[in-house]
C-alpha cells in the first residue's frame, strides 16, 4: 500500500520532509524505528560520557580541592597573631608618583628590594628553606592599611584590571629570594592609572608562592598616564631645568608665565633672584600665594645641585675688597688685598652684598677652576693705602671695622700669621676723610702690650714704625671710655722697619652699647720726630672725625641711644 498525498501524513507528524509519493508504510515504519534507536543510543552515550568526564575531572581536581578546603578552614580559624613568624618586607618603595608603562623603581632609581625577616626580631633570615623561595608580585588597593592581616584579607585587597583592560600589573612578576633577599630587576609596570580607585593610589604587594611567610606591602603611590610624564617634576632639579620643573609651578601656568616675563626661565635664574631679592621673587609668583606653597617652591629649588666650579667675583667700591660668589650669587668669601677676612660683622657683610647686588653688571665670571680652592691667586687688589696702623701683642685681638657709606676707604683687614707669631690687625687709611673701627671689649685687657703706628712711603716703599706701651685709666668725658697713655723715650734716629719709642700718645677707646664693642680714637699725640708726629696727628684727626660722624648717624637712627 502506497501513501500518496495523505493529509494525515502531511499533518503535524513531523515527517513532511519525506516525499510522500516515494514512501510506503513499510519504509516509514523502518525509518521511525531506526530514528528511535539512534536517539536512544545517543542519549545513552551522552550519559555515559558525562559520567566518565565527571569522574576524571573530580579525580584530577581532588588534590587541589582538598588543599583549598584545608586552607579555607585554616584561614577561618587563623588570627593575625597565630601566623608564621616569618614575613616579607619591602626595604624601599616606589616614589609617591609613577607613570603607566614606566619601570617601577625606588625613589633614587635603584631596584626595589624585598627581604625575608623574622617577625619577632626583625632580622634577616638568610638560611633555611624559605630563604630561597619564589615571591609573587601583585597590585594592591591603597586602602589596605591594616597593620596585621590574614591570608584571606590580603587576597581580598588584590586588585584586578578594569573591564576591557590589560592585566593591571605587567612584566616579570616573580622574584627568587637569594639568602633571604630578592631584587626586583624585571621591567614590571602598571598598565592603567590609579584614578579609578577610591584612594586614587596603588600599593605593591609580595607573597610567597607557597604558604610560609606574612605578605609584604609597599607604601601607597599614585599612578598617572604616561602622557603626563613630560610634566614630571625633577628631584632634585638641575640648574638648567625649566622653572616649571619646580613643585607648585605648573607648566604654562600663571606663575611660570610671570616668571618668564621677567626672564626667569631656569631654576638657576630662580635661585639667583631669590638670593638677590626674595621679596621681588615672591611678588612675581603672586602675593596671594600661601606660605605653605611658597615654602614648597623654595625648598624644592634649594635642593638644586650647583656647579661648584662656577664662581663670580665682584670688586667693591672700597679699594682692595673683593667678593666671591657661587653660581647663584651666594657669598662665599670676602678678600682684602688677596687675604681672606674671617669673622666679619654681619652688618658689614650685608652692606657689601647689597652693593654687589645693586651692581650685578660688575659681577664677572671666573673661569679658572683653581680659583675655587685658592681665591687669593685670582683676586687682584689695588695698591696699599698710604697710612697704616697696626695693633699687636695679643693672641685674640678681634679688631673689626666697617665702611662709611660716603667713603671709599677700607676700614680693616685681618692679617694672617703663623702659630708662633701673634696675629696683627691692620687698619688702613687712604686719602678719604672717614673711617671707623671697633674692638671686642672682651679682648681689651690683653690689648695693652704694645701699639704700633706705621706710615708707608709710597715712593720708596718703606715704612716708619713707632711702638708704645701704656696703661688704662678713666676718661672724664665718658664713663664708658678708657685711655691708653704711653710714655717712652724716643730714640734719636729712625730707620725703616725699626721700632722707635714715643714720648706721649693717647689712645681713647669708647664703648658702644649696641654691639658691645669699643670705638678707637687717637688724640693728643706728641712725638719727638716731626715725621712721626705728623703720622700720629694725621691718624688722630682722621679717626676721631670718622667716629664723630658715625656716632651722629647712629644717634639719628636710634634717638634713644643718644639719651
From Swiss-Prot:
UniProt region (DNA-binding), positions on chain: 147-263
Alphabetically ordered keywords of this record: Abscisic acid signaling pathway, Activator, Calmodulin-binding, DNA-binding, Hypersensitive response, Nucleus, Plant defense, Transcription, Transcription regulation
Induction statement: Induced rapidly by pathogenic bacteria Pseudomonas syringae pv. maculicola ES4326 and P.syringae pv. tomato DC3000, by the root-colonizing endophytic plant growth-promoting fungus Piriformospora indica, and by microbe-associated molecular patterns (MAMPs) such as flg22 and hrcC in both local and systemic leaves in both local and systemic leaves. Accumulates transiently in response to 12-oxo-phytodienoic acid (OPDA).
Biological process annotations from GO: abscisic acid-activated signaling pathway; cellular response to hypoxia; cellular response to molecule of bacterial origin; defense response to bacterium; defense response to oomycetes; plant-type hypersensitive response; positive regulation of abscisic acid-activated signaling pathway; positive regulation of response to water deprivation
Disrupted gene: phenotype observed: Reduced basal resistance to Pseudomonas syringae pv. maculicola ES4326 and P.syringae pv. tomato DC3000. Impaired systemic acquired resistance (SAR) induced by P.syringae toward Hyaloperonospora arabidopsidis Noco2. Plants lacking both SARD1 and CBP60G fail to accumulate salicylic acid (SA) and to express PR1 and SID2 upon both biotic and abiotic stresses.
Primary location: nucleus
Described function: Transcription activator that binds DNA in a sequence-specific manner, 5'-GAAATTTTGG-3', to promote the expression of target genes. Recruited to the promoter of ICS1 and other defense-related genes (e.g. PR1, PR2 and EDS5) in response to both biotic (e.g. Pseudomonas syringae pv. maculicola ES4326, P.syringae pv. tomato DC3000, and microbe-associated molecular patterns (MAMPs) such as flg22) and abiotic stresses (e.g. UV-B, drought and abscisic acid), thus triggering rapid defense responses by stimulating salicylic acid (SA) biosynthesis.
Family to which this protein belongs: Belongs to the plant ACBP60 protein family.
Subunit structure: Interacts with calmodulin (CaM) in the presence of calcium ions; this interaction is required for defense responses. (Microbial infection) Interacts with V.dahliae SCP41; the interaction is direct and inhibits CBP60G.
Protein name: Calmodulin-binding protein 60 G
Organism: Arabidopsis thaliana
Name of the coding gene: CBP60G
